[in-house]
């Protein structure tokens, strides 16, 4: 039986994540179709490998799509969210640095469309998030430490993923402490350590290729199709 491809709009198509999304989606033309690629500035070419490109200022005129994948900048987030709500399309967003007002807008939009916002779209990290929460619940009174390591060009510390894992630990009743390391070209490593008297548990995730984040975002887009409106976590989509 023929399956209609999921129509995607890639917002932030000129960035590193946007380029990875375009490349990986092109490997699955039977299930994924890039309806539009949106860049911050006017594109040098209007059509590349059959994909229509638009400037962010032209976003309202983008063709029909089922799900938008947004890895852009906070200033481009509002019009993307508004367009998804207007068209009843799902939204997968990994845009960082959004304000509290923008987070409130996300929560309001979740009443009308299915969406997921995450600091990390690795499926392994999604599983780690659940394991951390469960461990914190089971190990009341144990010390909880989160150590994150990244390449030397990463400026923010602790990383957004470390803070997300810390929130999972807090939901389980732990009080996490953070440490950060910047060295070489480390893509990303997150260690969550629970220490009791005479014993220690270490939960760790190591990323060796940035494509895992784009693959996770494409997985999330597929999983949002046909879902009821709501705000989902990546780990929810694994159920």
Curated annotation (Swiss-Prot):
The active site is at residues 150, 154. (S)-2,3,4,5-tetrahydrodipicolinate binds at residues 151, 160-161. It is found in: Cytoplasm. One of its GO terms (biological process) is diaminopimelate biosynthetic process. The keyword Oxidoreductase applies. The keyword Translocase does not apply. Coiled coil: none annotated. Pathway: Amino-acid biosynthesis; L-lysine biosynthesis via DAP pathway; (S)-tetrahydrodipicolinate from L-aspartate: step 4/4. It is an enzyme of class 1 (oxidoreductase). NAD(+) binds at residues 12-17, 94-96, 118-121. It catalyses: (S)-2,3,4,5-tetrahydrodipicolinate + NAD(+) + H2O = (2S,4S)-4-hydroxy-2,3,4,5-tetrahydrodipicolinate + NADH + H(+); (S)-2,3,4,5-tetrahydrodipicolinate + NADP(+) + H2O = (2S,4S)-4-hydroxy-2,3,4,5-tetrahydrodipicolinate + NADPH + H(+). Its EC number is 1.17.1.8. InterPro entries: DapB_C, DapB_N, DapB_N_CS, DHDPR_bac, NAD(P)-bd_dom_sf. Its main location: cytoplasm. One of its GO terms (cellular component) is cytosol. Keywords: Amino-acid biosynthesis, Cytoplasm, Diaminopimelate biosynthesis, Lysine biosynthesis, NAD, NADP, Oxidoreductase. GO terms for molecular function: 4-hydroxy-tetrahydrodipicolinate reductase; NAD binding; NADP binding; oxidoreductase activity, acting on CH or CH2 groups, NAD or NADP as acceptor. Belongs to the DapB family. Catalyzes the conversion of 4-hydroxy-tetrahydrodipicolinate (HTPA) to tetrahydrodipicolinate. HAMAP family: DapB. This is 4-hydroxy-tetrahydrodipicolinate reductase. It comes from Stenotrophomonas maltophilia (strain K279a). The lineage of its organism: Bacteria, Pseudomonadati, Pseudomonadota, Gammaproteobacteria, Lysobacterales.
């Amino acid at each position: 039986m023929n399956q209609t491809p999921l129509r995607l709009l890639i917002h932030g198509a000129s960035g590193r994540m946007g380029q990875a999304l375009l490349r990986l989606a092109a490997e699955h033309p039977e299930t994924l179709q890039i309806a539009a690629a949106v860049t911050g500035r006017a594109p040098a070419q209007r059509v590349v490998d059959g994909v229509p490109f638009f400037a962010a200022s032209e976003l309202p005129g983008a063709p029909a799509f089922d799900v938008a994948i947004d890895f852009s900048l906070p200033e481009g987030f509002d019009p993307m969210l508004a367009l998804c709500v207007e068209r009843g399309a799902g939204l997968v967003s990994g845009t960082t640095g959004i304000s509290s007002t923008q987070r409130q807008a996300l929560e309001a939009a979740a009443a009308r469309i299915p969406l997921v916002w995450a600091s990390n779209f690795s499926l392994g990290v999604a599983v780690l998030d659940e394991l951390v929460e469960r461990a914190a619940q089971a190990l009341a009174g144990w010390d909880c430490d989160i150590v994150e390591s990244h390449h030397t060009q990463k400026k923010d510390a602790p990383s957004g993923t470390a803070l997300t894992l810390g929130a999972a630990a807090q939901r389980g009743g732990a009080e996490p402490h953070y440490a950060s390391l910047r060295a070489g070209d480390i893509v990303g490593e997150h260690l969550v350590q629970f220490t009791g008297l005479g014993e220690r548990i270490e939960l760790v995730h190591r990323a060796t290729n940035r494509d895992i984040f784009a693959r996770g975002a494409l997985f999330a887009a597929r999983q949002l199709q046909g879902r009821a409106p709501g705000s989902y976590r990546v780990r929810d989509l694994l159920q």
